[in-house]
UniProtKB/Swiss-Prot annotation:
The keyword Signal is annotated on this UniProt entry: no
Catalytic site positions: 91, 156 (proton acceptor)
Pfam families the UniProt entry points to: M20_dimer, Peptidase_M20
The protein's name: N-formyl-4-amino-5-aminomethyl-2-methylpyrimidine deformylase
Amino acid sequence: MDQQIYSLQKKVEEHKEELIQLAKTLISYQTPAPPARNTEGIQSWIAGYLNELGFSIDKWDVYPGDPNVVGKLKGTDSADYYSLIINGHVDVAEVKEDEEWKHDPFHPIEKNGLLIGRGASDMKGGMACVLFAVKLIREASIELPGDLILQSVIGEEVGEAGTLECCKRGYHADFAIVADTSDMHIQGQGGVITGWIEIKSSQTFHDGTRRNMIHAGGGTFGASAIEKMAKIIAGLGELERHWSIMKSYPGFKPGTNTINPAVIEGGRHAAFIADECRLWITVHFYPNETHDQVAAEIEDYVNRLSDSDIWLRENRPVFKWGGSSMIEDRGEIFPALEVDPGHPGVLALTASHQKVKRECPIIDVSQSVTDGGWLYDAGIPCVIYGPGDLHNAHSVNEKVSIEQLVEYTKIILDFIISWCSRKKEQ
């Protein structure tokens, strides 16, 4: 088998133009999110590609115009051999009108050993590598004992959980790789959750009554919801500082766990005391925490702060956490993902990496978030491992090294065969 894998890896080199053309084809589909609802074309193409390779296809709309595609290659001995999910998203970062691209971002070019175009690094380059590796395996008539599941999902760029929908649909495996941007480091990640904190007064007052609320002898029990929200914002800053002192995680700089007061909305008219205010926050947390845990910590802190305020005791803050889409309901959740370096899947991926790169892979944490947290949250051991680096993801003239695409294809090819040909440990 090792000799057969080596022969296939040589084919990656010999046919790298086919790999590059495959990446160019994926990039040429204009799938920015926002605006989203534009992935039907690329997903139909991927479904057709996998169907021709013998995969059973499951394609369904998550949103109109945005379908998920899952291809499954049933193993010859699924019960006894390890199964694998490889996951990737086909939406890309938006391209704004004022961005100064040197060429059309959706007509990719090669220059100085780089592939340039929107999504080259994040993460259509990685998707192309996986598809090409699978094509070579199928053309070589290699039968995998374990199941191989490829997930091509939508919505990652805007917090739409295409991957969560795959989990809800019942897709599970012994190990998963998210082929997203990691510069070929094996990575875990912290998590992100957004939330709304709303204060609403039980009464509405005219602007002319403000003096009666804020001066001695005024006799009116009332307050501006905006000013009370300012008190909560200050309190969140105190909690954030407490976290930075008391919490830590290897690979993250102290204070990476943040509470960002991102958007504030409030009041109804300049002639009224603000009777409502809403604060939209973004919370970053560490890999060993859950989004439910940090949300509960924030609620507890804000509620205790409210207990110390006479008006807030009577007009309690209300919390709404997460959401299914930054587009649809202005909310998102990216669960954290913790890597176990001793897991058989991580050890096998390390071995595949070493065979090609002649060095151990770096195992660390991403400074961003991916859909990997949803797989981990569903009980699937998972890592982020893909070509491209975060400095290029979302950037003007986004690019990825062609050499890295070739290397990654060789590694993922070796890993698919090795892992899916390995008997489960009893």
